């Protein structure tokens, strides 16, 4: 992913699911080593505790001028941003959007059960020519009993993923790259 972003030189980046900052550290290192700094880098994280870690990482790499750490539930942030976009299209001054309304590169992480939903939420934020990166959710194996809550979440998440790929196949170019530990998926609007 780091290499792909190095080639893209994306000016506007959104990372969904910053966690404790492993991937963010790779990206900050890229910005530092390549001398390439994006216009804006939004890191969305559901938990405030992790946001503290991300803030420390941001200050260590001196990314305050271009980084926005956003804490909140993705569904709500997307809804608020779409409402902001509609309100600002009327010409009214409505402040800043919770997350940037368009990005050249979007990285979507999250649980296997939520990954398809998160990708679907973020696709409208993809700029023309932009790339959305995610990992394919784990595929369920064997029989899963209906009482197995975790197993059923995995099955339902994977089924939602298959439905998403089928529907996006009409509107996006989709590439799959098997890697150690999973399959990287890239989506570009047709």
Model-derived features with residue positions:
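Class I SAM-dependent methyltransferase Rossmann-like catalytic core
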Residues: 1-11, 25
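Conserved class I S-adenosyl-L-methionine
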Residues: 9-21
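Local beta-strand N-terminus motif with an aromatic residue
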Residues: 10, 102-104
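Conserved SAM-binding loop of SAM-dependent methyltransferases across substrates and taxa
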Residues: 20-38
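Conserved beta-strand positions in the Rossmann-like core of class I SAM-dependent methyltransferases
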Residues: 42
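S-adenosyl-L-methionine
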Residues: 47-101, 113
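C-terminal substrate-binding/active-site "lid" region of AdoMet-derived donor-dependent transferases
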Residues: 99, 112-190
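A conserved beta-strand element that flanks and buttresses the S-adenosyl-L-methionine
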Residues: 107
């Amino acid at each position: 992913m780091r290499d792909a972003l190095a080639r893209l030189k994306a000016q506007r980046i959104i990372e969904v699911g910053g966690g404790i900052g492993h991937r963010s550290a790779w990206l900050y290192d890229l910005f530092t080593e390549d001398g390439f700094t994006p216009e804006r880098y939004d890191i969305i994280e559901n938990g405030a505790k992790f946001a503290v870690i991300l803030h420390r990482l941001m200050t260590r790499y001196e990314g305050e001028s271009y980084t926005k750490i956003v804490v909140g539930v993705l569904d709500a942030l997307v809804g608020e941003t779409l409402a902001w976009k509609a309100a600002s299209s009327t010409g009214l001054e409505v402040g800043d959007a919770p997350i940037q309304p368009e990005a050249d590169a979007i990285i979507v992480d999250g649980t296997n059960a939520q990954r398809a939903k998160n990708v679907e939420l973020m696709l409208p934020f993809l700029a023309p020519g932009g790339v959305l990166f995610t990992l394919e959710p784990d595929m369920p194996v064997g029989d899963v009993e209906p009482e197995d809550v975790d197993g059923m979440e995995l099955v339902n998440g994977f089924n939602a993923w298959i439905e998403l790929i089928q529907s996006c196949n009409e509107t996006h170019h989709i590439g799959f790259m098997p890697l150690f530990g999973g399959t990287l998926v890239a989506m570009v609007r047709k």
